[in-house]
């Protein structure tokens, strides 16, 4: 059937263009790196350098001393992958151990001691094997392994920063 030749005519209406709804931009969260955090600088790690480790570090261990109920005070002094660890635990018993460190080819930092720390009172204090890898913003994420079953989180803070 042919279409009618007289189309209905109406006054045209102007439709306002709808403005696009403003989309809330997700705020970019830039986490501040604590100035005393251990930063495993990517370039150094790639080249096998542990310069970022040189200096004095306070290790914050998530363990408690059975005598005081507080974590032991552990301080590492490291220069060119060699150094000492000083532990104060219990009723101010001071222990020392020789430490050495290095980078694995996978970029993990290892900090080890040869045996337990020797203490001023003649006792020995177990020292963990520490493993760190670069996390968010290259801040070191570390864990302290005392034995196959005991692994605790550990945070390094630059001493005197």
Regions found by a protein language model. Name each.
Residues 36-69, 142-143:
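Tryptophan-anchored aromatic micro-motifs
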Residues 67, 116, 126-128, 151-161:
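N-terminal localization leaders that direct proteins to membranes or organelles
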Residues 64, 118, 147-149:
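Short glycine/acidic-enriched loop and turn motifs that connect beta-strands
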Residues 63, 67-108, 142-145:
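N-terminal glycine/threonine-rich, aromatic-flanked beta-hairpin/loop signature
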Residues 74-80, 128-135, 154-156:
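Broad, structure-driven detector of short, well-ordered beta-strand segments within folded domains
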Residues 1-52, 159-161:
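Amphipathic/hydrophobic helical signal segments and adjacent flexible N-terminal regions
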Residues 28, 39, 97-108, 137-161:
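Edge beta-strand at a domain terminus
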